[in-house]
Amino acid sequence: MNEHALKNIPLRLYNTAERQKQELKPIKGNHIQLYTCGPTVYHYAHIGNFRTYIFEDLLRRTIQFFGFSITQVMNLTDVDDKTIRGAIAKGITLDEYTKPYKDAFFEDLKTLNIQSAEYYPAATDYIPAMIEMIKVLLDKKVAYKGGDGSIYYAINQFPRYGCLSHLHLEDLQAGASERVAADEYEKEHVADFVLWKSYDSERDGQIYWESPFGLGRPGWHLECSAMAMHLLGETIDIHVGGIDNMFPHHENEIAQSEACSGKKFVNLWMHAEHLVVDQKKMSKSLGNFYTLRDLLNKGFTGIQVRYLLLQTHYKTQLNFTFQGVESVKSSLQRLNDFIQRIYNIQTLQSDGQVDLLVNDALIRFAEALADDLNISSALAAIFDFVREINCLCDVNQVSQKEAETVINLMKKFDTILGVLTFDKREESIPVDLQEAFAKRQQARQEKNWTLSDELRDFIHQRGYLIEDTPQGTRLKKQ
């Protein structure tokens, strides 16, 4: 398996800001700094969230596949409009409200075999860093105090505002007299956005922090800027999230971070498309809102859900159906059965085709991933390889040594997929076949060739072979 050839394949990823694919070139050496938007822990994450997290996991694994080292930060938003409302409604502290959802999120990551990030910062642990950023923005006259006591970002003081979502600042009607205090809003409501939300006892209960600007709490957009810059530096290689994060969240992150540091915040932006259910937007009112736990309760496994969310390109809208999950079962079964078949190869000689097929499959797989994570083409390379090797197995043209190479390639594929099983299964031979085999052995000793042949044919009809080995005669699945 020629892994050296992978070094000559450039990894090209689609940059949302530039609207084109670009070769990944690290800021420092061979190391990638990756910031991925994590959950707002006001509820259990739903399968639409996990579509994005699976994409982020695919990106992380691909970066490593091509030989880069990585530091990944995935934030946990544990203070925002929704978490505060939830805590107040239940009459508990913010931490008491968010902790069960944080714990559940990490359980779900494990269930889906999503690799761990190096850092999972919670917003409430970085309030001092956020306050310091606001001080800098106020000093630079990019932020101001509104009549409601909150601190706002003046978007007309940042000429590049709109660079990510391709809005034109001169066309916007925002200004000091137009502000938005909500964490989430649409493009038609573009306005100066909140950095520090002034405390309101009716709205916020007992949830607030002290600051030089008065009691309150940070705006959602500021949280990610502060955590990203604190943990990864003023300029990072890649920032990733769902397409719904692009505006206003990521747009506002750029404005805050670059105004604060005077440097480019992110070199490459990537966004995953939405997930829909049966071609409809997921919503509780339509009864098509599913968490991972809902799917597990319906009998599906985390690996099946992972494969389903993985197999569609991240820039394509993913249509979730239960028929789709069922089809995934057969795909995984085919791959895992293939692995078991290769484990059972006993042939010592072959015609030498396997090494060529292994190298071709690896290059096809790598080139597909290098083309903006083209997972459908990567999967096609795997299934073509499985078909070709199965054909060789049918005519006993895969040796034991080559079988090891095939297994190693499947393990290499699974560093990306994270769905295969490599535990060798011991076949359980039915009792009646074991009895027939023992009777045949006895018949041969007694030279009862007619009975011996009848029992051999019975065993063959049931899908088993009688194989002679150095350890003696045994039954083997065909």
Swiss-Prot record:
Residues binding ATP: 284
The entry's keywords: Aminoacyl-tRNA synthetase, ATP-binding, Cytoplasm, Ligase, Metal-binding, Nucleotide-binding, Protein biosynthesis, Zinc
Subcellular location: Cytoplasm
Reactions this protein catalyses: tRNA(Cys) + L-cysteine + ATP = L-cysteinyl-tRNA(Cys) + AMP + diphosphate
GO biological process, one term: cysteinyl-tRNA aminoacylation
Note on how the cofactor is bound: Binds 1 zinc ion per subunit.
InterPro entries: Cys-tRNA-ligase, Cys-tRNA-synt_Ia_DALR, Cys-tRNA/MSH_ligase, Rossmann-like_a/b/a_fold, tRNA-synt_1_cat_dom, tRNAsynth_Ia_anticodon-bd
EC number: 6.1.1.16
Gene Ontology MF terms in the entry: ATP binding; cysteine-tRNA ligase activity; zinc ion binding
Cofactor(s) required for function per UniProt: Zn(2+)
SMART domains associated with the record: DALR_2 (SM00840)
Motif extent ('HIGH' region): 39-49
Short sequence motif 'KMSKS' region: positions: 281-285
Residues that bind Zn(2+): 37, 224, 249, 253
A single Gene Ontology CC term: cytosol
Repressor as UniProt keyword: no
HAMAP family attached to this UniProt entry: Cys_tRNA_synth
PANTHER family: CYSTEINE--TRNA LIGASE, CYTOPLASMIC, CYSTEINYL-TRNA SYNTHETASE
Family assignment from sequence similarity: Belongs to the class-I aminoacyl-tRNA synthetase family.
Binding partners and assembly: Monomer.
Protein name: Cysteine--tRNA ligase
Organism: Protochlamydia amoebophila (strain UWE25)
